[in-house]
Amino acid sequence: MVMTDPIADFLTRIRNANQAKHEVLEVPASNIKKGIAEILKREGFVKNVEIIEDDKQGVIRVFLKYGSNGEKVITNLKRVSKPGLRVYKKREDLPKVLNGLGIAILSTSEGLLTDKEARQKNVGGEVIAYVW
């Protein structure tokens, strides 16, 4: 089966593993998925991220994070810009997810950034996803 949107697939796998309270998730690697996983780690939404290199494309192992009572750290993930409808925002129009409680992940000329980092660097770009 041909996958038309690997980023949406990655976010859906994280959402499903999170709902099922799995500790670890493995997905096929790509540069943009690695970047998204690193942002989730840096922002505290996941415990750790490992990149496993093999002879093919590699695997990203994501260690999901839960609170002390088992509550989910990631409430939801939403794909914004899709292959059929790209969404671009200027620096002054960058969205705030839940008034700053969540993050927007953007693909910019500076690489993958959160909405806060993009504001600091004064760049806009394609809004990949919202995480809260």
Swiss-Prot record:
One of its GO terms (biological process) is translation. Pfam families: Ribosomal_S8 (PF00410). Keywords: Ribonucleoprotein, Ribosomal protein, RNA-binding, rRNA-binding. The keyword Ion transport does not apply. Transmembrane segments: none annotated. One of its GO terms (cellular component) is ribosome. One of its GO terms (molecular function) is rRNA binding. Part of the 30S ribosomal subunit. Contacts proteins S5 and S12. One of the primary rRNA binding proteins, it binds directly to 16S rRNA central domain where it helps coordinate assembly of the platform of the 30S subunit. Belongs to the universal ribosomal protein uS8 family. NCBIfam families: PRK00136.1. This is Small ribosomal subunit protein uS8. It comes from Streptococcus pneumoniae serotype 19F (strain G54).
